[in-house]
């Protein structure tokens, strides 16, 4: 059996601050069989919306609810969680010391400000699950959120897998052109 010891959060932050850098600012603290716990710093440099599809329907509560949520806890400073809810953009402020449980399969964009730190907990992804990074047009006069680009992948390591996808988006202007209105989205 492995020896279990508590983690000194203050010491860990002092020794690992460099791991919480753009564009993702994410470091995996724990990866078990059931869940992943990540430390996330700010500021981040991304405008994508992440969709985690590891969905399992519950028999209790309401039949349409899922148990594959993402848990956010804001340790230091405030953040903003942009989501798409009922086919509409919505901003959810999460203040220092607050927690938020995001329903599964909700497109979300965590906006982290300078000198902020949070914890995020997610379920492990089954081999058949697919994550998505989506970019939406925010410049055209669209009636509902309009996807410009979507990358689909199996996520085994969020911290390392998101960075090259985000960097491709930022570097390729033509991939940021909206197919409906022709506007070019900002890289960040």
From Swiss-Prot:
Residues annotated as binding O2: 46
Main location class: cytoplasm
GO biological process, one term: L-tryptophan catabolic process
Binding site for substrate: 70, 112, 122
Record's GO cellular component terms: cytoplasm
Listed pathway(s): Cofactor biosynthesis; NAD(+) biosynthesis; quinolinate from L-kynurenine: step 3/3
Locations listed in the record: Cytoplasm
Role, per record: Catalyzes the oxidative ring opening of 3-hydroxyanthranilate to 2-amino-3-carboxymuconate semialdehyde, which spontaneously cyclizes to quinolinate.
Protein name: 3-hydroxyanthranilate 3,4-dioxygenase 2
The species this protein was found in: Aspergillus fumigatus (strain ATCC MYA-4609 / CBS 101355 / FGSC A1100 / Af293)
């Amino acid at each position: 059996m492995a020896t279990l010891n508590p983690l000194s959060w203050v010491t860990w932050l002092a020794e690992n601050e460099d791991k919480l850098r753009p564009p993702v600012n994410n470091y995996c603290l724990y990866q078990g069989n059931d869940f992943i716990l990540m430390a996330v710093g700010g500021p981040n440099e991304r405008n994508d919306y992440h969709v985690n599809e590891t969905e399992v329907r519950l028999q209790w509560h309401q039949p349409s609810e899922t148990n594959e949520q993402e848990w956010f806890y804001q340790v230091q400073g405030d953040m903003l969680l942009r989501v798409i809810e009922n086919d509409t953009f919505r901003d959810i402020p999460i203040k220092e010391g607050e927690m938020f449980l995001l329903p599964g399969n909700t497109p979300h964009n965590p906006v982290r400000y300078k000198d902020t730190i949070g914890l995020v907990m997610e379920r492990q992804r089954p081999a058949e699950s697919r994550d998505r990074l989506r970019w939406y047009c925010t410049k055209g006069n669209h009636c509902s959120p309009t996807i410009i680009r979507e990358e689909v992948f199996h996520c085994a390591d969020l911290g390392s897998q998101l960075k090259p996808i985000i960097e491709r988006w930022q570097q390729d202007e033509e991939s940021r052109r909206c197919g409906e209105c022709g506007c070019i989205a900002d890289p960040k």
